[in-house]
UniProtKB/Swiss-Prot annotation:
Upper classification of the organism: Eukaryota, Viridiplantae, Streptophyta, Embryophyta, Tracheophyta
Species for this entry: Arabidopsis thaliana
Protein name, UniProt field: Exocyst complex component EXO70C2
Gene: EXO70C2
Phenotypic consequence of S215D: Phospho-mimetic (PM) mutant with constitutive inhibitory effects on pollen tube growth
Main location: cytoplasm
Domain of life of the source: Eukaryota
Family: Belongs to the EXO70 family.
Tissue: Expressed in anthers, pollen and root trichoblast cells. Also observed in anther tapetum.
Outcome following mutation: T446A: Phospho-dead (PD) mutant with reduced inhibitory effects on pollen tube growth
Region listing for Disordered, in residue ranges: 1-71, 210-229
Gene3D superfamilies recorded: Exocyst complex component Exo70
Amino acid sequence: MEKNDKDPDHDDKSKGDEKGDVVSDAHPSDDAHHQDGISNENVDVVGNAETDHQDPGDNNVDKVSQGEEAPEIRQTLESLSEELDQFLPTLSLHMEEHKDSTEEKGEDGYFQIPQFVGKFLDLFEEKLSKYDSGEPKTVWYQDPEEVSSLLEAVDRVSKLMGLLLNTKSCLDHHESLINHAGSIQQRAMAFLEDEFRIILEESVTKESVVVTDDSNSQRRSTADQQDHQNDVVVSQDHDQMLVPECGDQEIEYPGYPEDVVVVLRKIAEKMKAGGYGWECREVYLVGRRNILMRTLKQDCEFEKVSIDEVQKMSWDTLEREIPIWNKTFKDCSSLFFPGELKLAERIFPGDEGNLFCIVTHGLAIQFLGFAEAVAMTRRSTEKLFKILDIYETLRDSFPAMEELFPEELRSELRNEVTSARSRLGETAIHIFCDLEHSIKSDSSKTPVPGGAVHPLTRYTMNYLKYSCEYKDTLEQVFKSHSKMEREEEEPVESGNSAFASQLMRIMELLDGNLETKSKQYKDIPLSCIFMMNNGRYIVQKIKGSAEIHEVMGDTWCRRRSSELRNYHKNYQRETWGKLLGFLGHEGLMHNGKIVKPNLKERFKSFNATFDEIHKTQTTWVVNDEQLQSELRVSITAVMIPAYRAFMARFGQYLDPGRQTEKYVKYQPEDIEDLIDQLFEGNTSSSSTATARRRT
């Protein structure tokens, strides 16, 4: 590099200019702005300052000529920075003045570069070496003055390089200086790039935010709340709907303190001004993507999975992944994505949209791919509620997420969501309608012991009850995504939605299936008990769900209750009507006298028949306490008055003592006690009716 030692006077002349900033060639629009600020007044001031600055030098020359040793003038990076700040406008002015002549003649004349420029570069290089020497790198950016000093020095080097590279005389005569300055600039930018990465990774602080997941809160508050790792379980053997607890949750966004954001923004500005904006952006993009994914994994247990991986998952595994997906999608929509947009805006103002999209767009597409993959898995009834959960999450949370993206990406994401929701909706409809097919195909020939509620009834009603907890969503799904043709079916009743009509169709099929299964019992009374058990269970489930009751209506419930009363009457007639026949007077009187042999036989027949009824019907099952009580009360109301009247009328004709004990096995109170033992599902080996004899 050619040192500036040819003409001291030329050095003085080169410094006549304003004190101001000059921007690099990467930003020509700013050059014009600063050039407008140049004035002759400023040039004179700087020129005078330079003249004054040379006086000590002249004295030193005289002293040297007289054999005296000149005192050393200590130059610091700060003092040289001030001199460079005064010189840069001069160089900028020279570049502008000779721009036209350069274009016309291909030359702009020789321009002297002061010696302090090289000295400044040397001292700045020493400063960089100090930072690279192994000392803690966190020190400098925690000190505001050090941050300002370093970044201003970097900015001066970038401005100097921009002017040198755009001034032909400098390119022609100061190649060595340009190479030296360029090397230092590259080193400085590499240092800032590393520091930007370190600060980005190591200065993350978690900002706690409380969010309320109130989606479906009304639905879930009405369902039975029990601890379970899965979201929904519909059991064929139990009456529980297992759903998760919901409410306020505290989630943490991986952000930065304000002072750290300021440092990151300043570094980004200086790197961009020096022509290294792309490198800074890349560091930011990679860093924030990693931080975001790490946070989602640690706090939400979310991990990226491909469509192929989703489709290969067992349902047990996928069932655990779906609630994680739902929570992560909601958290990204309400906190993480808005946080990323705000952070990009604070560090890269004016370019936040592009950076935000690059950080989050891939994750958004991953979310939607998961949803579509779930919809494409093999259909089964237990998947319905998980699929509806995903559908609701997309429906309720995507609009807020969508608004964060620019229009061109917004349209793409909207199309992806529409596609995913369509697949989910169609799958949900098929699964719900598969319940109809499962009822039709259930042809089990083994009757349920004791006439209890059939597992198909329990499963279907639990399924329908919880389905109706999603009633609004299912109504929307059937309306928006149903492509099923039912030309062979009767038209939908006026005023009923497609979902309501499908639900009523399922109820009709269940009724018909139960009627068929009741015929599997050879004992007609037990068949009646079976229909009463299942009918009461259905009615109670419907009355216990406002949503399903709204669909089925009061008329349906009244009609079903009437059918239950008919089964009750049939049971009572078939069982207790025969027993009441033994308590009649016919055949016991002849010519006004009691026929004792007939009376004794009548008591024996009554006892044997009652014992058989008791033995059999204590094994029958009526789990509904109200129905069990109603049956016992109605039996007691019929049997006890009749038996008590029969005993009062004919018991006196049996001889007291052994004869009475032999034929009068039960007192009315004993009969009442034994009736209260019916329908307990008692399968013990005892076949003898026992009751405490009352005296």
